[in-house]
Amino acid sequence: ITTTGKENIPQGPVVFVANHQGYFDIPLMLTQLDKPNPLVAKKEIQKIPMIRGWMEQLHCVFLDRDDPRQSMECLRQAQELLGQGYSVVIFPEGTRNSGGPLGEFKAGAIRMATRAGVPVVPVCIDGSHLLMKKGSLWIHPAKVNIRILPPISTEGMARDEIRALPEQLRQQISDELDRLRG
C-alpha cells in the first residue's frame, strides 16, 4: 500500500470523499488517513457483528439506500459529527465500482460538507478491488495506491459551485486514477 498526500489533510474536521473500488476500502481509509475517522456506510454492514462493533466505536453512521428519509437523517448525523470536530469519510458513488469507470457522485454525500462549512478532501484509491475480487473469499496480493488530493474549501461557496462540486470531485479523482495508471 502506497499512500501519498497526507500533507494535504488540513487541521480540523473535513469530509474525505473517496472512490469505492472494493471490500477493503473501509479498512484502508481507517488505517491510511491521519487517524481513524467515522464513515458513512451502508446499513447492511451492521449485519456483520465483528465489523459493526468497531464501526460503532468509531461513531460511524449507517445509511439505508432504499429509504430517502433515513438517508437524509444519516447525513444529518454525519453533519453533527463534523460540528463536534470529527472528520467523516464517505464514498459518494454509493457502491463499489470494481476498478471500472467512476459512478455518479451523489450530491447528498457532499451536501453535509457544504452545510457544515468544512473542507472536502478528495481521496483516490486504485487497486483495492484486486485484494478480494467480487464473489471471492480469498485475499490476494495487490498493489494499492492511495492519493490524498488538495482540499477544497466549501466556506462561502455559491449555489452554482455547490451544485457543480460532486462532478468536480468525481472528475478530479477520475483524472488522478488516469495518472496513477499511466
For the regions a language model picked out, list residue spans one by one.
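Short secondary-structure boundary/capping segments
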Residues: 6-8, 29-31, 52-53, 79-80, ...
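A generic local structural motif
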Residues: 1-4, 24-26, 75-77, 132-134
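Thr-Gly-centered strand-to-loop micro-motif
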Residues: 4, 40-42, 64-65, 92, ...
